[in-house]
Amino acid sequence: MTTQSSAGPQSQPSRDFFASSPSATPGSPSKQASQASKQPDALVTPSSVTANTSVCADNLLDHHQHEPQHDAASVVIGIEGSINDSAAIHRRRQQPRRAAVQNAKPLFLAEDEDDAINWPVADQEEGDDFFSTQLADQKVKRPARATVNSDEKDFQPSTLSSLSSPPSETVYKRSPPSDDVQASNGPAKRPKKSWSTPASVATTKSAPRHCSPTPDPRLRHDAFDRRYIGTFVLSAWSLSKGSSYVKPGDAVRIFRPRKKHATAEPKIASKLTNGGMQKAKQTTLNFRGASAGPTNFFTSKQKSKEKEHFIVRFSNMRGFEVGRLPLEVAIWMSKLIDAGIAEFEGVVVDCPPSLTVGCDIILQVKAYIKFDAFFSTLLGSREFDDQNEALRPETAESDLEKTLRERKISLLRMFRVCDLKPRLSNAILKSHKASDDFSSEAMLDQYGGDIQGAVKHAGSDLAISTENGTQLPHAGEDASSTAIDLDVEGDTDAVAHLEIADQLQSAKRQTDGDADTEENDGTELNLNQLDQVYRKAQANDAHLPEVEPPESFVLTLRPYQKQALGWMKNMEMAPGQSSSSQEQSVTQQGNGDTGERNVSLHPLWEEYEFPLDYDNPQANERLILSATRLFYFNPYTGDLSLDFQRASKGSRGGILADEMGLGKTIMVASLLHANRTSDPGEESEGEINAVDAAEGDVSTKRKGSAKQTSLASAFAASTSSVDQRKALLKASVSKGKASLVVAPMSLIGQWRDELIRASAPGSLTPVLYYADTKGDLLAQLESGKVDVVITSYGTLVTEYRRFLDGGGASNRHLSVSAPLYCIDWLRVILDEAHNIKNRSTMNARACCDLVSRRRWALTGTPIINRLTDLFSLLKFLRVEPWGDFSFFNSFVCKPFQAKSTKALDVVQVILESVLLRREKKMKDKDGKPIVELPPKTIVVKELEFSELERRIYDNVYRRAYLQFASLKANGTVTRNLSVIFSVLMRLRQAVCHPSLVLKAGSKVQSGGIRKDHVDRNGEVGVGEGDHVEVDADAVEFGLDSDHVGGNGTPSTQDLRELVAQFQLDEAGEAGDDSTESYTKATVERLIGEMHGDQATVPPVVSDGENECPICLEESQISPCYLPRCMHSACKACLVDYLGQCKQKGDQGACPTCRKGPVQETDLIEAIRTRPATRAASGGASPTDRPGKACTLTSVPSVIYVRNNLRTSTKLSALISHLNTLRATEAAFKGVIFSQFTSFLDLIEPVLTRYRFHFLRLDGSTPQKVRDKLVLEFQSPSPTNHVVLFLISLKAGGVGLNLTAANKIWLLDFWWNSSIENQAIDRIHRFGQTSPVSVFRYIIKDSIEDRILLIQKRKDMLIKHALNTDNHPHGTKPNSEMLANLDLLFGE
């Protein structure tokens, strides 16, 4: 141990050699060193010698990892001495030993060549540095590592291999990097830089040619291989038996055993076969899906199921394995070794003279942290699988977050056992760690104090005792509700302890080793809880001061909108230093003195000082003379840095969450006029970070005033190089002058029109940046003529992908491919900001990576379902410290899952400072409603399936139920959610229209099923290989066009011919004169009504003519006529009457004159297109045909349609309702919403058949066409006729202004009522002057009934949300999702 500590640290591989090789040579280090002076200088590489030569070289390489060298020549000499002594080593291997020693596994076998191949790239170059004194381009490189273990993939460090420098330059000059730097996002070439260039110049001025705009950030610091962290003592246990292994004072090597790959083993020699070859046992490969049932809906689940072990072993210096470290230590130590973050050396303190298996060995362990660990952060180099991330549940822990969490826990544990305490820490961390309290209650006390009515947290204190006395919580409990007693001195982190303990339990149960395999669900909120969250934020909204807009804003604001303008102007001001509750002063620990920085430490970071290793005076000397003496650690994310982490002044901006329809666009327009430019001295993220880069180590430069910085580098998920981005933004052409508005595609045109309407001519210039309207954005901004750029989320994501695919800021053509990401925006405004609620989506990542000085999120629903919906908004706004998911998850999500009401109180405190929300029902300071809107009426109509529809639906439901039951029986429901949701979608479509469950290749015409869609067996195809068995009556869903004019509406001549063919009886003889006379008179009257020519209409024969002979009701609005006799009756009465006749086996006949036979499809329906009082006005040509652009003059006052269209129950109810309204109201405008565009396809021909004028908007509608459609719908109709707007719920359910309508039809149900409410608020909003009616259709005994039950069930959850979990420990209740599925498929 003394010999190893006599010199400073030397360059070494990024991971301990024994992590990939479980063996070591039994050569003596002292003897190897003694042979150093006997060998000449030579160049030797591990791949150029025999197996034994490689063995010896590798052993000495590993030895030199712990024993630094004085110069490069001694390294070469020592290595060659070891190589030439290979014969002696071989003879020592053959010496007889006792049985225990013979059973011991010598660590160097013939597999060493494979070990060398599997070394990481950084290990290869480190080895070459030891064996060579030549330049880097002359070295012989080993092959790249073939495979990476699953648990190491996310831990691949960005290593910097330090070349061996002359002794005189080691301390005072920075070591240049090797040719290939293994960065976190792949190999990166070393910047070409002169060896004699001073470090300071290289940091601030010199930029490498042909590479990134700025040098490697490692060059800003004095490079070192590793630094001493601390020493701790542990009790290991022996795996060997004998007396010749170790004794007190011996040094030992600590390493990770090589992992076994799941491949068939080769043939091996066996003594049982007398030296022959025995076939190895066959290994069955499990590909995690072929035999384990259906695959998961995102593939990262497979990775988490792979077996993982925490074994850490130690061997003597001769290379023989001695024992293992205890599992409590191995859990966190193995993660650090695998990730190349730390290395460990040990010395035997005490052990028995003769070892036995299982006996205790006391070790003193030294911990070293590697230089590369400070640059291997995953926050700046995230690799995402877009497809899998999109399918990932919103609250599920991603692979990156799991890796960061394990890294964080391991580092915290290492610092704790080494008794390494922070030198500087902010007030939150200091107080919380001192009291061991990282719960929501502590955060509430820190940020907002107590809140009245808070419910006392009820948590379980039961615990499980482990072998070493550690108190472990029961599975599923949170750290905030469990007392943990760990035998570690100093301050502790309860959250980290809990996760360490969970890992320990998992390892002892021999599970897959995941610390947290359960998805992070359980943060769903119901309406009452949402009201509770918003209540505190809305408490003082009525008393906000009103601020008048500038003269350039030409519209008149309402009082509540003036209050919003004043609040937004205040939020864009720089927060005061003393008044900001989120700024924490930096206090200094040690020696009892305190001090303040002009630049405050980031509230999530702590400052540490590298301790001195008193056993290594040379290393201490280098540390004292080095400028890199401090490092920084984030205990919430596990990030390490050598750069000072500065805090910002606070976020500029907030969340404008006014309810839909209150005019958020107009409020933001007034802000754009009020705050046109940035404040003097206001700096952007790029400028702030560039200043930090230029200053280098802030710990040595205390001067300078505090500058604002948002958390782009700490929170934003940027896949580009941070330094490259800083330089790029520093040269931005905008420099905080223009604002960017990001909105759904349907709204960008509306944003432009609203901004122009609200602005005086020439005062504000908005431009669209979308499709062919993009132009040269940078040139427009440079001209100074553009104030606001409006783009869509889709365009932003497209440019973000180019930004990533092009190498980020290093792309020379970034200004052409992705100009939105090379502009320093004054403000970024997200309209409908709930589009980024899922933090894993490209929408969220693209928005968060924009650089801006001010940020705004506009949404009527900042929280839709879960508390985690709020996180993405906080991250986008750079709200410290809540924009970090580890922090948010620890103090909000997990306590809420543990039934702690304090979690909601913390959310209230957060929103109080960044959110403004007003609702339509709220009142102003005088007690008057802030906005007076006309009443809104919601009518729900219950319908029943027809007999045929019921058979089709029951068949689809039966097959769906069987599929769900099969998955549930196999326990694979959660792994096949995509299948379940597909089945549920088919059920919901079957409720709307049976044709929607046809095969994708089938085409539906006129809202029906064609005959060729039914096979010989009468089966109608359904999606995904299912079939619905129906009889040939399914064909009746088609439209029989016989005797029908174009589009199913008979012309005048057609009507005469149609009636004439029914006037002949079965014998071909005409009827009596009275019947014939009545029929002719009725036909002429109907034709006259159709033209609106009342002068030619014969007088009514009798007053009782309009009376239905079945129900005896009068005033038939849309009567049906029997063509044989032209007697009339209500359509519903006739259809029911003819159906009863068919059931009895009788032929249908006229209920008045008994003339027949009559079928249901023979009926002729008379439909009025406008009220009867207006029937005389206007006229039409008999040859007019219907279409999408029908006008009043082209539509007859009465149309006649043959009842030969078999459609769905919902569509029939919709058409009947529309016909009734058209006959009673002069004119109206209505909007029809549906989630399925295929259902809209079926509605279109039916509306055309009944001569309704309609427009349509869905996701396929181009943006320019959308603007024209909305403008046409909002404009007054010159002919004052009925206009309908068909809109898909996703494409037009948000943002649109459709106040011209006053009637709404919602044809299907969504799982979340907030989406439907947003659609309703497109009509019932600011500017609406008429009462609004909402009509909903629900089918009895269908899945829609159960969807409504789920909505009601969510509302009732508040009654049980705060109750403690009564389930026995060790079991889990069904999740909310599974409970809902059980409800949907229940009996």
From Swiss-Prot:
Binding-site list for ATP: 658-665
Extent of Low complexity compositional bias: 19-40, 157-168, 577-589
Biased composition (Polar residues): 1-14, 194-206
Signal peptide bounds: none
Residue ranges occupied by any Helicase ATP-binding domain in the UniProt entry: 645-880
EC number: 3.6.4.-
Domain (Helicase C-terminal) ranges: 1213-1379
UniProt biased composition (Acidic residues): 513-522
Location in the cell: Cytoplasm; Nucleus
Residues spanned by motif DEAH box: 831-834
Keyword Nucleus: yes
Gene Ontology CC, one term: nucleus
Renumbered residue ranges of the record's region Disordered: 1-49, 132-219, 503-528, 573-598, 676-704
Matching SUPFAM superfamilies: P-loop containing nucleoside triphosphate hydrolases (SSF52540), RING/U-box (SSF57850)
Keywords recorded for this protein, A-Z: ATP-binding, Cytoplasm, DNA damage, DNA repair, DNA-binding, Helicase, Hydrolase, Metal-binding, Nucleotide-binding, Nucleus, Zinc, Zinc-finger
GO molecular-function terms, A-Z: ATP binding; ATP-dependent activity, acting on DNA; DNA binding; helicase activity; hydrolase activity, acting on acid anhydrides, in phosphorus-containing anhydrides; zinc ion binding
GO biological process: DNA repair
Family classification: Belongs to the SNF2/RAD54 helicase family.
Described purpose of this protein according to its UniProt entry: Probable helicase, member of the UBC2/RAD6 epistasis group. Functions with DNA repair protein RAD18 in error-free postreplication DNA repair. Involved in the maintenance of wild-type rates of instability of simple repetitive sequences such as poly(GT) repeats. Seems to be involved in maintaining a balance which acts in favor of error-prone non-homologous joining during DNA double-strand breaks repairs.
Alphabetized PANTHER family for the sequence: DNA REPAIR PROTEIN RAD5 (PTHR45626:SF22), TRANSCRIPTION TERMINATION FACTOR 2-RELATED (PTHR45626)
Protein name: DNA repair protein RAD5
Organism lineage string: Eukaryota, Fungi, Dikarya, Basidiomycota, Ustilaginomycotina
Name of the coding gene: RAD5
